[in-house]
């Protein structure tokens, strides 16, 4: 009844107790061909890190017609300064694309823009924006190119928090294994109507 059965049970049927442990339970891992993404919209997202957490630049395509998110490339590294991030974006040929980066790092965004990545923009964040973004992504088919090993590792380990009293998973993800996946969520803001999610949810819930 839905591309993501867990999503359908929770948001359409209201069966929140059946929430799967994984935030993204339905992910395909394979080689993505150029033909598949023909005509799809390119997106690029950036999550900042430094010493303990890596900076994660992730990109891919979104096919509105096929309701499919393709994650096709990643660059993940710790200890990167902003000028190094900008240089890598330029080397990868992504500097002319719209890049959506974590809005908590306005200074970093400004420094990367000054280094020649002129279309970098801050992400939009509002109340429950993380969960709303996750919900929208889970309405799509998710395909990760098998060469994106960091993103795959995160998808296999990114889980919902568990209520210690009830033992049930709650509607808030653990803050771990989420650097690449946060970058995906940011990047998709440039091509997808994620802001419309509240309306979609109300329609599903009747």
Task: List each model region and its residues.
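ATPase catalytic-site recognition across NTP-hydrolyzing enzymes
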Residues: 1-49
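Anionic group-transfer/hydrolysis microenvironments
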Residues: 47-49, 104, 184
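Short, low-complexity Ser/Thr-rich regulatory SLiMs
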Residues: 48, 61-63
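Short beta-strand scaffold segments in enzyme catalytic cores
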Residues: 55-60, 185
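Mg2+-dependent endonuclease catalytic cores in nucleic-acid-processing enzymes, primarily RNase H-like
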Residues: 58, 65-175, 194-195, 199, ...
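Acidic, Mg2+-coordinating catalytic module of metal-dependent nucleases/exonucleases
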Residues: 175-193
């Amino acid at each position: 009844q839905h591309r993501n059965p867990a999503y359908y049970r929770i948001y359409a049927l209201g069966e929140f107790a059946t929430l799967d442990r994984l935030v993204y339970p339905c992910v395909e891992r394979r080689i993505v061909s150029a033909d598949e993404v023909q005509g799809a919209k390119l997106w690029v997202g950036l999550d900042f890190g430094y010493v303990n957490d890596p900076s994660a630049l992730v990109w891919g395509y979104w096919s509105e017609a096929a309701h499919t998110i393709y994650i096709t490339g990643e660059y993940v590294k710790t200890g990167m300064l902003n000028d190094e991030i900008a240089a890598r974006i330029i080397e990868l040929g992504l500097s002319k694309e719209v890049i959506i980066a974590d809005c908590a790092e306005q200074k970093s965004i400004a420094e990367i823009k000054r280094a020649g990545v002129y279309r970098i923009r801050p992400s939009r964040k509002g109340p429950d924006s993380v969960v709303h973004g996750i919900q929208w992504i889970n309405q799509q088919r998710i395909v990760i190119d098998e060469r994106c090993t960091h993103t795959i590792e995160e998808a296999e380990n990114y889980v919902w928090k568990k209520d210690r009293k009830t033992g049930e998973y709650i509607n808030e993800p653990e803050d771990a294994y989420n650097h690449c996946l946060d970058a995906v969520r940011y990047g998709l803001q440039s091509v997808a109507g994620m802001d419309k999610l509240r309306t979609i949810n109300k329609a599903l819930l009747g």
